[in-house]
A protein has these predicted regions:
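Chitinase-like catalytic core of GlcNAc-active glycosidases
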Residues: 118-133, 145-324, 338-345
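Conserved small/polar residues in nucleotide/adenosyl-binding loops
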Residues: 363-370
């Protein structure tokens, strides 16, 4: 059974009421369409029959007082709401007493309601986008309607050095760029199903590398990655330390180290929080300088443990990830399963990892082609 959710709202006057004052709270279904149009959202109207407003919605402020409260009760059952759908409860305050005006910014109270998934472990999948369309992730649905995959990682964008412009930048091959340019058609359907979409970043055979940027370089590149997430509506960045020569010099670069890898993760998370009005992840694949031993980052003498700016970690093929400092096993993948090599995991093994406290499983390189194992 689903317990009813009760919310208490307070209506406050700017001045003390000289006489009894009444305001009515009404359910205004039309407001949801208006809100969606203005904010480019896709909220669904919460069923009005499941919303009860005390006292028929009338808020009465006695003479001599400045405020009064009213209780709103939401009573959905498990079958009333769909997974991966966000519902809006659109409540409008309408003045009932002559001479009282409700300010525009206080006219609507919008509750957002979502059905909490029953899954106890997250499934994260790396898609080799040169071979496979990430939209295939939508095809894997559990019996109760939840998507099997919780996050898709696009493999991959690159960290590269532009010698002509003397800067480090994110380089996307034609397949990656096509996904970004066509985000509304090829990536946003995943997000609308509740599947996060991350862009993986790895080296590309030159001096630029994830673990070799100066503090200033980390800040600049982190801001670029955050801007990419904002522009293309992505849910975060993955880091994979491979294929870098680490031979750069100048203000962009520092000697490669786990300290600089941690700094890039910190700056990327910080920039995403500042730019993106949605939850974002920093996800790590343990290779090279990116390991569970990543150190803390100190900014103006304040320590920031890796768990503050890293959300999920995974090991290389077949391994279980150890947590970074401050993180529990809930942020770790208990196994990394390479699907295109025919690797798999039994439900018993997955449950055992879940019972040990691991919070996710990693899958790589699914293939929908005929004859492929996935």
């Amino acid at each position: 059974a689903v317990e009813p959710v009760k919310k208490t709202l307070t209506f406050t006057l700017e001045k003390t009421a000289t006489a009894e004052t009444k305001v009515k709270l009404v359910f205004d279904e039309r407001h949801v369409d208006e809100y969606n149009f203005d904010h480019a959202t896709e909220y669904v109207v919460f069923p009005e029959k499941l919303c009860t407003i005390a006292n028929d919605g009338v808020i009465t402020i006695p003479a001599g007082e400045t405020s009064a409260q009213i209780e709103v009760t939401l009573s959905p059952s498990a079958s009333d709401l769909e997974y991966v759908t966000t519902y809006m409860v659109p409540l409008q305050a309408v003045a009932q007493t002559e001479g009282i005006v409700v300010k525009d910014e206080a006219e609507y109270v919008d509750f957002l309601v979502s059905r909490i998934g029953s899954k106890k472990i997250r499934n994260i999948c790396y898609f080799e986008v040169n071979d496979c369309n990430p939209l295939n992730a939508i095809e894997y649905i559990l019996e109760d309607g939840q998507p099997f995959f919780d996050a898709v990682v696009l493999f991959a964008g690159n960290i590269n050095w532009d010698a002509s412009k003397q800067k480090v930048y994110m380089n996307a091959n034609p397949n990656v760029q096509a996904l970004l340019d066509n985000s509304e058609e090829l990536l946003q359907p995943l997000r609308k199903k509740g599947i996060k979409v991350l862009l993986d970043i790895l080296g590309n055979h030159d001096q630029a590398g994830i673990a070799g940027l100066s503090d200033w370089g980390c800040e600049q590149f982190g801001k670029e990655l955050a801007q990419i997430c904002l522009d293309y509506k992505l849910d975060g960045i993955g880091f994979d330390d491979e294929y870098s020569s680490y031979s750069g010099s100048g203000k962009w670069f520092a000697g490669p180290s786990s300290q600089q890898a941690a700094r890039l993760c910190y700056e990327t998370k910080k920039a995403m929080k500042e730019l993106c009005p949605w939850e974002t992840w920093v996800h790590l694949y343990y290779l090279g300088y990116i390991q569970s031993s990543l150190p803390s980052v100190f900014i103006d003498g304040v320590e920031h443990k890796p768990s503050e700016f890293i959300d999920n970690v995974c090991a290389d093929y077949g391994g279980a990830a150890r947590p970074v400092n401050g993180m529990g096993l809930s942020g770790c993948a208990g196994n990394s399963i390479q699907l295109n090599y025919g690797n798999s995991i039994s439900s018993e093994s997955a449950k055992a990892l879940m019972n040990q406290g691991y919070g996710c499983l990693l899958y790589t390189s699914p293939s929908p082609r005929d004859g492929a194992t996935s």
